[in-house]
Curated annotation (Swiss-Prot):
Recorded catalytic activity of this chain's protein: UDP-N-acetyl-alpha-D-muramate + L-alanine + ATP = UDP-N-acetyl-alpha-D-muramoyl-L-alanine + ADP + phosphate + H(+)
Protein name: UDP-N-acetylmuramate--L-alanine ligase
Family: Belongs to the MurCDEF family.
Name of encoding gene: murC
Described function: Cell wall formation.
Enzyme class: ligase
Species in which this protein is naturally found: Lacticaseibacillus casei (strain BL23)
Enzyme Commission code: 6.3.2.8
Biological process per Gene Ontology, one example term: peptidoglycan biosynthetic process
ATP-binding as UniProt keyword: yes
Gene Ontology terms for molecular function: ATP binding; UDP-N-acetylmuramate-L-alanine ligase activity
Pathway: Cell wall biogenesis; peptidoglycan biosynthesis
InterPro entries membership: Mur-like_cat_sf, Mur_ligase_C, Mur_ligase_C_dom_sf, Mur_ligase_cen, Mur_ligase_N, MurCDEF_pg_biosynth, UDP-N-AcMur_Ala_ligase_MurC
Record's keyword terms, sorted: ATP-binding, Cell cycle, Cell division, Cell shape, Cell wall biogenesis/degradation, Cytoplasm, Ligase, Nucleotide-binding, Peptidoglycan synthesis
Positions bound to ATP: G110, A111, H112, G113, K114, T115, S116
Length: 436
């Protein structure tokens, strides 16, 4: 790849910022534009010295290669200007699809667990071989002459069909984007189409009934804890330090692995990593060493201590993710009360999953909901957070300007969950708690 100047429209997007960091590491000139409001991804961009400008068509110069975020339409002023200048314009997923061609590429797809699994795989392979990676939490690393390229593959709007990777891990199939997909069959169709673009093998979760139906040109290996899985975790042990297991490929013992992560899903994510490493004939002892020193990814069970409280920040916004996050909190802190603070994400999703939200949030010792976070595409809806709290014993709606109800808890765990701007509620609570 010859050196070029890449201009990102929407550089603070989580995938976009990660891709910007990868290209910067590989020696290219990188700059871009976005809203001026602070976004958690800009810390990494600023540390790399990557220029972030406010949107302005005058930013674009002859010779730039433009990478446009998927949320911007063709009539965006900067995209229009790029066309006037005759610049090459890629959409994010199109560019990533081209970039991975020079490596042994491993994508991670699925409705839930993508970012955690991508992060775990990137960390583990990096400790064993030269690895570039792009994670959906805004983290990206480009290592010149890498053997592996690990990336998160998002199924939204079928964008992942731009990818033809060597391997694909598929964590699960769920109807997670009711604003785009028509139902489970439609999502399955997208995954099966992608499966037929994979070059070497697919590693899929064995307990997913949809993934069990996959038909592909390459082998599909299933991972899990049941006898019918190809890659299997046995002798699973979960305690307050993390999770350990013996990994088998059919009847062959690959090795014993420990990962300092919590929740049932963490064992599955680690097993998927072991499966890919095994197929690439990497040393199991080195893989075990790297899994054992993993420290997690941004916004996935990120913890801090303040006063006598443990505060957890997590991106969970689908009922299955909330269930997994609360399960992880119970494993790590079996003797503490678990307080859930959840920001529902979009009216359509909240309405589609109302009974499931009631069920999973009832598993916390106490539940609070913030008002629903609306998206740019959908400003209002028929459902309110009060409709959910009314169905959970003792639950209430909490507002950023009054986080006092949380001050009644001591020596407990507060888990803030959501994909919107839940962090502003967490900050408001931390400020109150620190002053107390």
């Amino acid at each position: 790849m010859t050196e070029a100047t890449y201009y990102f429209i929407g550089i603070k997007g989580s995938g976009m910022s990660a891709l910007a960091l990868v290209l910067h590491d590989l020696g290219h000139q990188v700059l871009g534009s976005d809203i001026t409001q602070y976004t958690f991804t800009q810390k990494g961009l600023a540390a790399a010295g990557i220029k972030m400008l406010p949107f302005d068509p005058a930013n674009l110069k002859p010779g730039y290669t433009v990478i446009a975020g998927n949320s911007f339409t063709d009539d965006h002023p900067e995209i229009k200007r790029a066309k006037e200048l005759g610049l090459t314009i890629y959409r994010y997923h199109e560019f990533l699809g081209k970039l991975i061609e020079g490596y042994t590429s491993i994508g991670v797809a699925g409705a839930h667990g993508k970012t955690s699994t991508t992060g775990l795989l990137a960390h583990t392979l990096s400790g064993v071989a030269k690895t570039s990676y792009l994670i959906g939490d805004g983290t990206g690393k480009g290592i010149p002459d890498s053997q592996f390229f690990v990336f998160e593959a998002d199924e939204y709007r079928r964008h992942f069909l731009a990818y033809h990777p060597d391997y694909m891990i598929m964590t699960n199939i769920d109807f997670d984007h009711p604003d785009y997909y028509t139902g489970f069959e439609d999502v399955y169709d997208a995954f099966e189409t992608e499966a037929n673009q994979v070059k070497k093998a697919i590693v899929a979760w064995g307990d997913d009934p949809w993934l069990r139906k996959l038909k592909a040109k390459v082998p599909v290996y299933y991972y899990g804890i049941s006898d019918r899985d190809d890659f299997r975790a046995r002798n699973v042990d979960r305690d307050t330090k993390g999770s350990s297991f013996d990994a088998y490929f059919h009847d062959q013992l690959i090795g014993h692995f420990f990962v300092p992560l919590f929740g049932e899903h963490s064992v599955l994510n680690a097993l998927a990593v072991v499966a890919v490493a095994h197929m690439e004939k990497l040393d199991a002892k080195l893989i075990a060493r790297e899994l054992g020193n993993f420290s997690g990814v941004k916004r996935r069970f990120a913890e801090k201590d303040l006063k006598d409280m443990i505060i957890v920040d997590d991106y969970a916004h689908h009922p299955n993710e909330i269930k997994a996050t609360l399960d992880a909190a119970r494993q790590k802190y079996p003797d503490k009360a678990i307080i859930a603070v959840f920001q529902p994400h979009t009216f359509s999703r909240t309405q589609a999953y109302e009974p499931q939200y009631v069920q999973v949030l009832s598993q916390a010792d106490q539940t609070f909901l913030t008002p629903i976070f609306s998206s740019a595409r959908e400003k209002t809806g028929k459902i309110r957070s009060e409709d959910i709290t009314a169905q959970i014993k003792g639950a209430a709606v909490i507002h950023q300007e009054d986080m006092k109800p949380l001050l009644q808890y001591h020596n407990a765990v507060v888990v803030f969950m959501g994909a919107g701007d839940i962090q502003k509620y967490e900050k408001a609570y931390e400020t109150l708690l620190a002053e107390e």
